[in-house]
Amino acid sequence: MLDRLFNAGETEVALAKKLGIERTLIVPGNADFQDRVYEEMGEKLSSALNLLLPLGHSIVTILGGAALARSAKYLSPDLANNRQLEFVPGRGALGENVETQSNTIVQEMAAKTSGTYKTLYLPEQVSDDAYKSLIRESSIADVLQDISQSDAVIHGIGLAQEMAQRRGYNSIKLSELREKRAVTECFGCFFDEHGKVVDRITQVGLQFENLYKIPHIFAFACGARKAQAIKAYMPNAPHQTWLITDEGASNMILKGK
């Protein structure tokens, strides 16, 4: 039914089957060289949300990322028709690039869809003791409650070394990640090319183990340089995941590179 509604092409069907997920949406081009890809991915995301989100009050959890940050402004105001959308960040701020933080993206998405948003201003990476203390704070607990009741999650898929550097890994930790052959990072977990978790950070926000409870999940990643990272993460992705990507990444994955 969903394939018919979205006129799924052979490539999209083949990619979803290869990755073991519900659906893929592929836009033309390669984001490594063509900025227009982000506009089309934003429009695809908007159409998918319009199809899948329930009417009335809907909560959408957002995890930051460069691709999603560049596509957020292309959400359609039509999403607000018969909906009261609430956008919440899925994790604390990285503190490096404000534009790609989930706190910034939720504000832009809410503005585009006449929705509301909440923020989570705290370090993304914390100690175990600090985590136990923080989640008891009323303002933080309120956001975490919304996350647990989300109708949809939209997340990126990061390159392991890049994400580790943003999280302040020192040279020793970066070297250890290379030795463990970490390829990708998602939800604070670092995965090798086979999808095995080789490292993990304690973060406040959406926990990977709880992702399976969310009705609709959108993985948002593009460009040929992300192909290996996408492929490495997908063995862990819940089946209800939709991947929104471009030809640059999809062609590399299907060719087995």
Features from the language model and the residues they span:
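Ligand-binding beta-strand-loop-alpha-helix segment within the catalytic cores
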Residues: T11-G56, A80-Q161, G168-N170, L174
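N-terminal helix-turn-helix DNA-binding module of bacterial transcription factors
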Residues: M1-E10
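Conserved acidic residues
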Residues: S58, D151-A152, P215, T241
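Gly/Ser/Thr-rich loops at beta-strand to alpha-helix junctions
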Residues: V60-S71, G95, L159-Q161, G223-K226
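Solvent-exposed alpha-helices and their adjacent loops that cap or buttress functional pockets
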Residues: L51-L55, L79-N81, A110, L144-S148, ...
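Short, solvent-exposed amphipathic alpha-helical segments in soluble enzyme
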Residues: S76-D78, Y169-S175, A232-H239
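Gly/Ser/Thr-rich active-site loops/lids in small-molecule metabolic enzymes
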Residues: R166-K196
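ATP/nucleoside-binding phosphotransfer catalytic cores, i.e., glycine-rich phosphate-binding loops
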Residues: G9, E193-K257
